[in-house]
Amino acid sequence: MERSTPDSTPVLGDVFKENTAVAHINNDFSATENIANLVTTESVASEPPVLLADAGSASSPAPAKSVSAKAVRSILVPPSAHLKYDIKGEVKGFPYQVRGDLRWAQDGKTYDARMEISHFLLGSRVQTSTGQLTGHGLEPTRFGDKVRSEVAAHFDYEKNKVTFSANTPDAPLLSGAQDQLSVFMQLAAMIGAEPRGFPEGSTLPFQAVGPRSAESWVFTVGATEKLQMPGGDVSALRLWRDPSGEYDPKVEVWLAAEVGFLPVRIRLTQPNGDFVDQQWRETQK
């Protein structure tokens, strides 16, 4: 197996001073995609998943209901936080363990998110998202994805399009669009504002922008489960996104009130059984 090493050490942008939740009233909304690709490096294979934990569920699902942009009534942006994760996965039968680091900062007007997955032999992968905070929640302006060199997506709200540094075709920018990282913070803001406002079986549709394209993602709301994480036992709401294509991964995310409804677990499962399982280890002050 060839070892790969990043060409430089990614640096987190300025961390905002305030560390408080920001509430907004929302009159319309929409958005979605994935943090899953973070572990992928040239030496590890494509798009492995992230996390494991024993979990129990309860209550029978309610009738499915799609919660669109205009159905979301309020937003509670989570306070700034620094979460660390233990990550285990498997690629083509090769098991591995790495560490994850999520830095989320917001000052009530703008936000900065950074997720890094790293290994001393395999190098690191970093995704970043920056943008504005509005009455609808997060409004990304730039999404970056870096292994050795960075590729990025830029959100042009005046021209209603997304452009890509990878020279792939522009994509139309839909109302409420998120990127593959900001979508998890947007979910946190939506669920945090109305923890009981999304019945089991509800669906949350998003346009999710990656480094080279934009896709449609739909998350389904599941039950609240008790998880045994490296950082302790937590109760978390499970949501998942089923594959929409032959090679798409299944994405599962668990959001916990204990950390402002930021993800305490993310699991990505490839059609061939490869997976990445990312579990919350600690919250740094």
Positions of PLM-derived features:
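Acidic, serine/threonine-rich low-complexity disordered tracts
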Residues: M1-K159, P199-K285
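Acidic/charged, solvent-exposed loop-and-adjacent secondary-structure segments enriched in E/D, K/R, S/T
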Residues: K161-Q186
